[in-house]
């Protein structure tokens, strides 16, 4: 499926080395101020080729809005956006056109469809996530109307964990690091792997603040379930924790429960979600990313005919995919919360009466 959402529906299209990538966002209420500069700034945050910690592919990622916006405001019709690819080097992939790259989707795409675009991974490439960031930027503009903010940053690199979580600092960091005191060690780990023609994994912390109580649609469209689905759909994501996540399984109930006073919750181990519904606390999730599978070492594989081969990749790839993945995680959380916000508008009769009576 290439679409995501119930009331706010995002559809993305395009391939890594195709003419363009883009998205169609359906369900945006009419009258929303569409700040094109903000959308472009979000794309610039994810854009490749800006540092030695990311791929050297240089894409401007200049977005064009094709529909759904008139005189700076949403019209209520689908908002279509396109980003034309400028810096494809398909020749870098000619040596693996019939070979399955270890760790990539080549093997599964070939067996599922009987055909694959070998140029940069085609549709399975993280290049697709630029379209998600464009759609997520519009979702952020909608959330801003309600005072809701979504932020993210890197909390772990190659096992080096952040001890502090400074989301403002992450906005200025080359690797979106949340902790300035371990950032140097994290950068060194990335560069060490890069010099060895290898890669490292890590984790991203993403949070939403100032949510109202009540977002989430039990039983089969719970806020945490959909959020996990959205974050797991990001390239190289391998696990998601909501709140304490896996750590909660090691605690007693007396330790894990977020006790309540008339002033509010004493703790936020649940990550802002109870029973699949937001409880008014910050919604917090952690996404774990595997090491980038594109490494420049000789590896064993097979070709489309089943012959064993030795493959050594060329091209331009991120040594640490979680850094730019943090911007994508923000976009996906924003899309989920905006979707839930629209769905919740019809959860009570009193809500409808405010509109129609």
UniProtKB/Swiss-Prot annotation:
Keywords: Amino-acid biosynthesis, Aromatic amino acid biosynthesis, FAD, Flavoprotein, FMN, Lyase, NADP. Pathway: Metabolic intermediate biosynthesis; chorismate biosynthesis; chorismate from D-erythrose 4-phosphate and phosphoenolpyruvate: step 7/7. It holds the Pfam family Chorismate_synt. GO terms for cellular component: cytosol. GO terms for molecular function: chorismate synthase activity; FMN binding. NADP(+) binds at residue 46. Disulfide bonds: none annotated. Its cofactor is FMNH2. It catalyses: 5-O-(1-carboxyvinyl)-3-phosphoshikimate = chorismate + phosphate. It comes from the Bacteria. Gene3D superfamilies: Chorismate synthase AroC (3.60.150.10). Reduced FMN (FMNH(2)). GO terms for biological process: amino acid biosynthetic process; aromatic amino acid family biosynthetic process; chorismate biosynthetic process. Its EC number is 4.2.3.5. FMN binds at residues 123-125, 235-236, 275, 290-294, 316. SUPFAM superfamilies: Chorismate synthase, AroC (SSF103263). This reaction introduces a second double bond into the aromatic ring system. Homotetramer. Belongs to the chorismate synthase family. This is Chorismate synthase. It comes from Nitratiruptor sp. (strain SB155-2). The lineage of its organism: Bacteria, Pseudomonadati, Campylobacterota, Epsilonproteobacteria, Nautiliales.
């Amino acid at each position: 499926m290439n679409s995501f959402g119930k009331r706010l529906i995002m559809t993305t299209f395009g391939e890594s080395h195709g003419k363009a990538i883009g998205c169609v966002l359906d369900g945006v209420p009419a009258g929303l101020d569409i700040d094109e500069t903000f959308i472009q700034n979000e794309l610039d945050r994810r854009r490749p080729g800006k540092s030695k910690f990311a791929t050297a592919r240089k894409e401007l990622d200049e977005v064009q809005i094709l529909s759904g916006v008139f005189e700076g405001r949403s019209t209520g019709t689908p908002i279509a956006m396109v980003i034309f690819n400028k810096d494809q080097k398909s020749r870098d992939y000619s040596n693996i056109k019939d070979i399955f790259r270890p760790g990539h989707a080549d093997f599964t795409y070939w067996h599922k469809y009987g055909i694959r675009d070998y140029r940069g991974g085609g549709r399975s490439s993280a290049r697709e996530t630029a379209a998600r960031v464009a759609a997520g930027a519009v979702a952020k503009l909608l959330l801003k109307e309600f005072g809701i903010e979504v932020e993210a940053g890197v909390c772990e690199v190659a096992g080096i964990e952040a001890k502090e979580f400074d989301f403002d600092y992450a906005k200025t960091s080359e690797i979106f690091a949340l902790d300035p005191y371990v950032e140097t060690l994290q950068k060194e780990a990335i560069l060490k792997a890069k010099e060895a023609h290898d890669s490292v994994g890590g984790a991203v912390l993403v949070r939403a603040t100032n949510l109202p109580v009540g977002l989430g649609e039990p039983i089969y469209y719970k806020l945490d379930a959909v959020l996990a689905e959205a974050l797991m759909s990001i390239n190289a994501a391998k696990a998601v924790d909501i709140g304490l996540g896996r750590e909660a399984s090691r605690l007693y109930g007396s330790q894990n429960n977020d006790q309540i006073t008339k002033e509010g919750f004493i703790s936020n181990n649940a990550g802002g979600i109870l029973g699949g519904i937001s409880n008014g606390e910050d919604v917090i999730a952690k996404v774990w990313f595997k090491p980038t599978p594109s490494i420049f070492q000789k590896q064993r594989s097979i070709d489309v005919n089943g012959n064993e081969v030795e493959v050594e990749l060329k091209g331009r790839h991120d040594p640490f995919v979680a850094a730019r993945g943090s911007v994508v995680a923000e976009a996906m959380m924003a899309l989920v919360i905006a979707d839930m916000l629209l769905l919740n508008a019809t959860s009570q009769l009193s809500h409808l009466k405010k509109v129609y009576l």
